[in-house]
Amino acid sequence: MSRLLYRLFGIGRLPRRERLRLAGEGLACLAEGISLTIAWRDFRRGGRRVKAHQQNATGAVALTRERLLVYASSKPVLDIGLADPAADRVTVSCPNPNTLSIRLQARDFDPYASGQITYWLLVPGAAALADLWQRRERPADKG
């Protein structure tokens, strides 16, 4: 279904401006029109509390020399700068050849939030993307 939405309506495609910005950052990987699931567990922020919730979407994932970006529909839902110290606390794994799992603690990116957020992306070559994340250049590597 996600491929159909992508091909017919462009849902899950990065905006042109974002694509140009990513190209300038040294785009290592880009997958558009992919299925993704976002899951919140024991999530709290302000007055909102979620014990467990999942949301499916069509989106895109990109990895550059500077950041990891995930879009759901046409909105950015995850934008992690590789220079951010919290990036080292993000768990990226490949539970099967076509699934990429990105798990993080909400508090690492928002001091007013708590709980766990997991993104599951159905992307061809997920293992290669997970490997790129593991081998990314960290700020300490530059010095």
Go through each PLM region and give its residues.
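Anionic N-terminal interaction surfaces
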Residues: M1-A60
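Canonical phosphoinositide-binding patch of PH/PH-like domains
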Residues: R107-D131
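Low-complexity, intrinsically disordered/propeptide-like segments
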Residues: E25, P85, R103, L132-R135
